[in-house]
UniProtKB/Swiss-Prot annotation:
<feature type="transit peptide" description="Chloroplast">
    <location>
        <begin position="1"/>
        <end position="140"/>
    </location>
</feature>
<dbReference type="Pfam" id="PF05198">
    <property type="entry name" value="IF3_N"/>
</dbReference>
<comment type="subunit">
    <text>Monomer.</text>
</comment>
<dbReference type="InterPro" id="IPR019813">
    <property type="entry name" value="Translation_initiation_fac3_CS"/>
</dbReference>
<feature type="region of interest" description="IF-3 like">
    <location>
        <begin position="291"/>
        <end position="474"/>
    </location>
</feature>
<dbReference type="GO" id="GO:0003743">
    <property type="term" value="F:translation initiation factor activity"/>
</dbReference>
<feature type="region of interest" description="Head">
    <location>
        <begin position="141"/>
        <end position="290"/>
    </location>
</feature>
<comment type="function">
    <text>Involved in chloroplast protein synthesis. It enhances the poly(A,U,G)-dependent binding of the initiator tRNA to chloroplast 30S subunits.</text>
</comment>
<keyword id="KW-0809">Transit peptide</keyword>
<feature type="compositionally biased region" description="Acidic residues">
    <location>
        <begin position="493"/>
        <end position="530"/>
    </location>
</feature>
<dbReference type="InterPro" id="IPR036788">
    <property type="entry name" value="T_IF-3_C_sf"/>
</dbReference>
<dbReference type="InterPro" id="IPR019814">
    <property type="entry name" value="Translation_initiation_fac_3_N"/>
</dbReference>
<keyword id="KW-0648">Protein biosynthesis</keyword>
<keyword id="KW-0150">Chloroplast</keyword>
<keyword id="KW-0934">Plastid</keyword>
<dbReference type="GO" id="GO:0032790">
    <property type="term" value="P:ribosome disassembly"/>
</dbReference>
<dbReference type="Pfam" id="PF00707">
    <property type="entry name" value="IF3_C"/>
</dbReference>
Amino acid sequence: MVRSSCLQCDQPSQGSNSTFGCGGPLAAVCATGLLVLVLYSPSSQTANWSAQGISTKALYPAVPVPSTLLPGSAPAKHQLHVWRAHAMSEATTNNSFKQSLFGYNAISSIWLQLAGVAATFFAFGALMAAVTQRKEIAVFSASGQAAEPEGAEPLKRPFPSPAAKPKPLFSTPANSFSNIFQAPPSLRTDSTYGRGPRSTSFTDISNWPSNNALRNPQSVIDIGGGVDFLGDRSPGNPFTRLRGSPSSTLSNLGMGLGLGLGKGKGFGKGFGKGRGFPVEEEVEEEQEVLSWADRRRALADPDAPPMNEDIKYPQLRLVRAVPGGRDEKLGVMSRQEALELAEAEDIDLVLVSIDTDPPVAKLVNYSKLKYESEKKKKDSHKKGKVKEVKELKVSHKIGQHDYDVRVKQARKFLEGGHRIKVSMEFKGRENQFVEIGRAVMKRFQNDLADMGKADAVPKKLGTRLILNLAPAGEALKVIAERRAERDRKAAAEEEGEGDDLDFVDENEDEDVEGEGEEEEAEELEEETAEGTEVPTRS
C-alpha cells in the first residue's frame, strides 16, 4: 500500500484522488493557461470577429485582404499568422497602427496568448517538481511483500520546521543526498536530521544488519536513500549500499567517502566505492634492550665489526693482542669461555675473520685497535700524497705591503714542504717593463734564500715571467723538526702513554702534522692572490 503526503504542508493527501497534495493550485494555474490558449487562439479570434460583424478591413483599412483570408474561409493558421504580421507592418507604416490598436484590442490577444503560454510552462514545471518531490513510503515485510502496519500514523515531514532544515551537503535533489549521514530510524534517537545520533557509538553501528537484509529499501527518500549517480536505488541506511558488503566499522558511508578516507575511489562512480575504515589491531613489537655501552658503541661506530655478545658462533679461534705487533694464540674455545676471558681482562672480544673454521676472534681494546687502523690509513695516505706546487702571482708594480704578504706566504709554503712558482704577467705595452719584473723576481729570490732555492733564473714564457723555488736551508730544518716531533708522539702513543683513547682529539693530530698552518697559508693566498697594484713613477 502506498500513501502520499505533501512536502510543503506536512499534511497527508486526502483521498485517493488527491494525488498532488499542495499541487492542486498548480493544476488550477495550468488549466487557466490552457483556457487562455483556447479562447485567444487565432481561429477562435477570427470566429469572434465574424460573430460581431467586424470585418478585417475595419481593423486594417490600409491593407488589402485576400478573399482567401477573410473570416469564414477557414485559412490555415500559419497563413493567417503571416498575413497578420504583414498587416501590422503595413498599418505601422501608414500611421494607422493607433487605429488598429485602440479602435479594437487586436494586439492584446497576442499578449494574452504569450502570457498563457508562459503560465502553462511555469505551471507544468512546478507540477513536475511537485511530482518529483512527492514522498512515497513503502513498508516491506521480511518476505519482500508490501504490508501496511495497523494504526500507522500519518507521515511526518523529514524536518521539524523550515528553520531547522540543515544546509544540504551537495546541490542535488532533496531526495538524494541531503541527509546522507543520518542513521536509520531503528537507531535514531535525535529528532534533528542532518547528523548522526548522539547515543549511537561506532560499536553499535558495527552491529547493524548485514547488507543482504537491506536490499529491500525501508524508505525511498528517507535518510540517505534515493537514486545514486549511476541510477541505482540506494537503501534507507546510508551506511550500507546495495553493492558490496561492509568490511568494518563505518564501512560504507553512503557516498563511499571518496575524499581519501578509507579506500574510497572518489566521486567518479556514484560517489565511489567506499570500503570504510579497516580496524587494525595494534601489536606491540618486542624491542631488544641494549646496554648503555652497546648503544654508545653503536652510535660512535655504526660500521664496527661484531664484538662481545654480538658474536653468535659457538666455537672461536682466540688470539690476544700483544704490544710489539705479534698476537698470542690461545687456541680454540667456546663462545662462552671467550666472553668470560674478555670480561675478566676488561677488554673486548672482536670478531676478526670469518673465512676460517672456526672464525678468528681477538682479545683487544677495540678503541685502541680502531685508532691504530685509522692512523695506518693516514700514514699510507701521506706517503702516497704528492706535494702540490703553490703559485704566487706578483706584479712588476707591486706595493711594499703586498710584497711582504707574498714573502710571508712563500715562507709558510716552503716550511710545509711545497714547491713555489712565482709568476708575473705582462699585457700589451707592459712588455716594455720586463726588466723591472726581473728585478722584482731577483729581490724575491734573495729574500727567500734561507728557505728556498731557485731552480734557474726567471724565464719568460709567453706573456709570463716564471721563477721556481724549492724548499732548502731553514725550510728543510723545520720540516725535519716537525717530522721528529710526529715520530716521538707516535712512539709515546704506542708505548701506552694514552690510556683513554676514546677521546683522542683528531684536530690535535692534524695540527701536529702542520696541516693547520698550510690551511692558514692558503687562506692568506686567497685573500691577496691578485695583490694591490701601485702605479710606477714614469
